């Protein structure tokens, strides 16, 4: 059954990447889904392209993914997923769904979450692609100092100008 699940996951990603929806979706939509847990993150990132037609989204996801989505800065769960989703969406953890709620019982806990695209972003990223690259790089090597991780984007002098300790 695993090869079948992999094929379904590939189809979902290929469908999302095909831009088929571009000509069909003209209004504002609510999306409700039990996303396949193994491909939920790429799907969430892909949905950034459709913010202008998304009213809100409700997803059943693996609990650990929801924990990362809504994580606060400085928490162990806080990372790229947190930063990017919190830039685009107000999020609300609606309910925890214990694994005992399913038959057969899965190995993981689930959570139901609501995402509402911001009308006005919490801050302005002048170049969203560059912002995404910086966030990705910043969380790719957590054990390195921020100076070493982001040296291709920001000089040590610039860190000092904006009041960030480059030794963090």
Outline where the language-model segments fall:
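C-terminal lobe and adjacent flexible extensions of AdoMet/dcAdoMet transferase-like proteins
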Residues: 135-168
